Amino acid sequence: MKALSKLKAEKGIWLVDAPKPVMGHNDLLIKIKKTAICGTDMHIYNWDEWSQKTIPVPMVVGHEYVGEVVDIGQEVRGFKIGDRVSGEGHITCGHCRNCRAGRTHLCRNTSGVGVNREGSFAEYLVIPAFNAFKIPDDISDDLASIFDPFGNAVHTALSFDLVGEDVLITGAGPIGIMAAAVCRHVGARHVVITDVNEYRLELARKMGATRAVNVSKENLKDVMKELGMTEGFDVGLEMSGVPSAFHAMLDTMNHGGKVAMLGIPSGEMAIDWSKVIFKGLVIKGIYGREMFETWYKMASLIQSGLDISPIITHHFKIDDFQQGFDAMGSGQSGKVILSWD
């Protein structure tokens, strides 16, 4: 089968002929229709320090996808041939304390599709049936292929009550932009998103952000005054992993504010903890998606009218994968989709 593999321990990704994956008794075999390129895939492509420590070589990568069930393990119930599915990319152990308590998203033994095991940049993928999610008929393949990152946005945004609240999002990558759309859809008042990438900020405006602020040109506190905000943001969603962005968030949070952190800093990050203490801030770390509460909310949000389609800006055939990775690496894109049909 065709597959994109991290074939060598150097920058790049390679289109290869790989063996079709072998299915177990509790697995599904999925014929991939579309995949999307994630920021994690770009880290792997660029072979940065994290990738060098994490990714086995050679390995098929990728974890954002939609496909069709073409074979079913003999112990699997609830799926049939032809079901359209995406899937949770975090494979959990099932026996740790959190798994047994129903908090599978907090499994300490998580294995990542396309990170620790064979991924979805291939014509076929095998995953445990437990991890598969049936896609409703009224949700397109394009949208289904980005459910993984959309789930990060939904999990982060819905960590706290948003109705009538003022929300600051730091980092206008695709996940931050989708989070802005979610916040507006569920009833936040002002949703302000910050970045220095004007292309991405314009996407955020199209997706419903009240204000998309280029912090290299505008002062965030001036924007707050312009919006009539006198007491700071009620909810903060940190999506960038950039220390200066997090510092700006702490400076502008209201007393009693709540912060959800999805962005991963590149190293240790010093902050002024006195601001956290005296403001009484709540800070919550976010990793992945809640299984499977986030997935049901994703589908329901789209079915109730949330439009995240503007975040998809580029489509390529799999043979043109290099153009897709170039587009994603340029910073002048939203989500990039590769078609395997």
Curated annotation (Swiss-Prot):
One Gene Ontology term of the molecular function aspect: L-threonine 3-dehydrogenase activity
PROSITE patterns in the cross-refs: ADH_ZINC
GO cellular component: cytoplasm
Subcellular location(s) of the protein: Cytoplasm
Cofactor note (record): Binds 2 Zn(2+) ions per subunit.
Swiss-Prot/TrEMBL keywords: Cytoplasm, Metal-binding, NAD, Oxidoreductase, Zinc
Cofactor(s) in the UniProt record: Zn(2+)
Signal sequence extent: none
Record-linked InterPro entries: ADH-like_C, ADH-like_N, ADH_Zn_CS, GroES-like_sf, L-Threonine_3-DHase, NAD(P)-bd_dom_sf, PKS_ER, Zn_alcohol_dh
Catalysed reaction, written as an equation: L-threonine + NAD(+) = (2S)-2-amino-3-oxobutanoate + NADH + H(+)
Entry annotated with the keyword Membrane: no
Enzyme Commission numbers on file: 1.1.1.103
Record has Calcium as a keyword: no
Binding site for Zn(2+) 1: C38, H63, E64
Pfam families the UniProt entry points to: ADH_N, ADH_zinc_N
Binding site for Zn(2+) 2: C93, C96, C99, C107
Active site per the UniProt annotation: T40 (charge relay system), H43 (charge relay system)
SUPFAM superfamilies assigned: GroES-like, NAD(P)-binding Rossmann-fold domains
HAMAP family found in the cross-reference section: Thr_dehydrog (MF_00627)
Family: Belongs to the zinc-containing alcohol dehydrogenase family.
The protein's assembly and partners: Homotetramer.
PANTHER family, sorted: L-THREONINE 3-DEHYDROGENASE
Job of this protein: Catalyzes the NAD(+)-dependent oxidation of L-threonine to 2-amino-3-ketobutyrate.
Protein name: L-threonine 3-dehydrogenase
Species of provenance: Shewanella baltica (strain OS185)
Biological classification of the source: Bacteria, Pseudomonadati, Pseudomonadota, Gammaproteobacteria, Alteromonadales
Name of the gene this protein is made from: tdh
